[in-house]
Amino acid sequence: MSRRYSSATITLVILFCRRPHCRKISVRQYYQKRVIFYPTTLQRTACKKCLFLMRDIIISS
């Protein structure tokens, strides 16, 4: 698993994990300057990686 994740990406992934119905409008509310939109297929993959990322963050912190 690659570890090239920026803090903004991790935050977005966690957002998508907590809100599966999250769309581009909701993302724009959090990131007005930089709008990142995940397709539904990447969204599912991001949710799976999110669990591992959150576990790593909790352990390392």
Curated annotation (Swiss-Prot):
Q: Which domain of life is it from?
A: Bacteria
Name of the protein in question: Uncharacterized protein YmgJ
Name the encoding gene, please.
Answer: ymgJ
